[in-house]
Amino acid sequence: MELKTLRITIASVASFLILLSAGLGFTGLLSQKSNNKDYSAWMKNIDDNTALRDINMPGSHDTMALYSIGDLAGQCQSLSLEDQLNLGVRFLDIRLKLNKNELKAVHGIVDERASFASITEKIESFVKTNPSEMIIMSVKEEANASSSNISFEESLKSYLKSDIYYTSELLPNTLKEARGKVVLLSRYPNSTIGIPAYEGWQDSTSFTLPNDIYVQDTYKVTSKEQKQDEIISCFNEKGHALKINFLSAYRTNGFPPSYAPSSANDINPWINEEISKYNDRGIVLYDFVTESNMQAFFKGVL
């Protein structure tokens, strides 16, 4: 081997190790950064009288999960909240823990390094800048409270004082009712605000909530084909108030299990081709959402 070639090889290995030490590793190398395709106001040309159930809407699974444990488990997204919104994401899957009376983003035991105050600030700024848009914000109590003397909902209410928040227990009927609003979907027990989505939520299956929201959330699978079949089945569901189709999954029949990065590598390229077959797409929640996902999602429906 020539000396020049050897130097290039050593430099390449060194660069890879630097990426690993910076916390990019497997997940970071897999994730694509957006080229900033702007879908920040894609709802502006949708008629006010369009029923909410008839609007195809992209979303992100575990919206704030940008960090992981050992670069293996925890991360589900590579784009910031602002980038996701500007790229067209309109369903946010926000998962929180109450700690010392403050709400912070977590994914399981992983601290996602974002306060709910900073999250709501960014969402409010986006909606005020883009009043043609609406957002559905699912809020899940991801972990039990610690060192707190108020309830999860008491804390939540303190962040939702702006009139942009739609906290009725009933879904808006039309886009007109929801424009410029953030519609709250409540995934925590004993909620008194927001559209209830805690009672009846089942683990790793497809189900219909009491308010006729259909959910496909089969995340424990043994093959990519199993997950693909579940996604297609949800596309074919008709007549529900809403339908929410999670693309997230991990395969349980291996060691270590395949987490979000490798599952997204299987599902995202496939869904970019498959989704064109369906006009009634409902709400589709992506892991590692990218510009190519959004271009494929909106093709033929905008």
Each PLM stretch: what is its role?
Residues F116-D163:
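Catalytic cores of phosphodiester-bond-cleaving enzymes
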Residues L98, E141-A143, Y188-N190:
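Active-site-proximal loop/turn and secondary-structure-junction residues that shape catalytic pockets
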Residues Y159-S276:
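Surface-exposed substrate-engagement region within the catalytic domains
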Residues L17-L19:
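Hydrophobic core
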Residues L156-E177, I283-L302:
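C-terminal domain-boundary segment and adjacent tail
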Residues M1-S15:
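N-terminal Sec-pathway targeting helices
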Residues A22-F91, L98-T129, M134, S191-P196, ...:
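Long, acidic (Asp/Glu-rich), low-complexity accessory segments flanking structured domains
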